[in-house]
Amino acid sequence: MLEYLIVGQLINTHGVKGELKATSQTDDPQRFKKLKWVYIDKNGSLEKYDINGVKFFKQFIIIKFQGVDSIEEAEKLKGFYIKVDRANAVKLPENSFFISDIIGLKVYDENNQLLGELKDVIQTGSNDVYVVRDSDSKEILIPALKSVVKEVSIEEGKISVILPKGLLD
C-alpha cells in the first residue's frame, strides 16, 4: 500500500500573493478545508507545506501555503501533486478502498481463473467500472457492483468477481 495518497495537483498560480490553483483528485474536494498540511511531491521528493487558506473557484481549489507569498514562489510549485499521508486520509466505510490500493491487484473469476490485472477504475457516477487487462493486453470492463465483486483482498493481492453472463462474449 502506498504511504501517501494523491489528493490533487497544482496546475497554476492564482493572483500575485502566492496562491495556487489546484484540481482535486478525490471524491470530496471539501476535504481540503479540513487539512492543516499536505505534502508536495517534487519529482519523488516530498516536502511538507502548512496550509494557510483554502477557497473554491469554479471547479478548482485555491490554496495558500505558509511561506509561499509571491507569484514567483508559487510558480515553482506548478505541476506538482498534492499528497496526504495515510494517517490524514479520509476514513473509508467498510468494504471501501482507495483506488491506489487496488490498482495492480489480480482479478479472478468465480472458478478462480485469472482474468488479468486491475489497471484503472472509471468513476461513472452511478458505479465504478474496473478496467482489467488480460495476458493478451485486452481490456475487460467489469462493473464494480456488490453482485459482481465478491471479495477484495489487498493482503492477498486479489479481487474475486462473478462475471455477468455475456460479459466476455
Swiss-Prot record:
Pfam families from the UniProt entry: PRC_RimM, RimM
Superkingdom: Bacteria
Protein's UniProt keywords contain Lipid metabolism: no
Gene3D superfamilies the UniProt entry points to: PRC-barrel domain (2.30.30.240), RimM (2.40.30.60)
A GO MF term: ribosome binding
Annotated InterPro entries: PRC_barrel-like_sf, PRC_RimM, RimM, RimM_N, RimM_N_sf, Transl_B-barrel_sf
Keyword Cytoplasm among record annotations: yes
GO annotation, biological process: ribosomal small subunit biogenesis; rRNA processing
PRC barrel domain span: 93-167
Alphabetized UniProt keyword annotations: Chaperone, Cytoplasm, Ribosome biogenesis, rRNA processing
Signal peptide start-end: none
Domain remark from Swiss-Prot or TrEMBL: The PRC barrel domain binds ribosomal protein uS19.
Family, similarity comment: Belongs to the RimM family.
Subunit and partners: Binds ribosomal protein uS19.
Protein name as catalogued: Ribosome maturation factor RimM
Protein species of origin: Ruminiclostridium cellulolyticum (strain ATCC 35319 / DSM 5812 / JCM 6584 / H10)
Source lineage: Bacteria, Bacillati, Bacillota, Clostridia, Eubacteriales
Gene: rimM
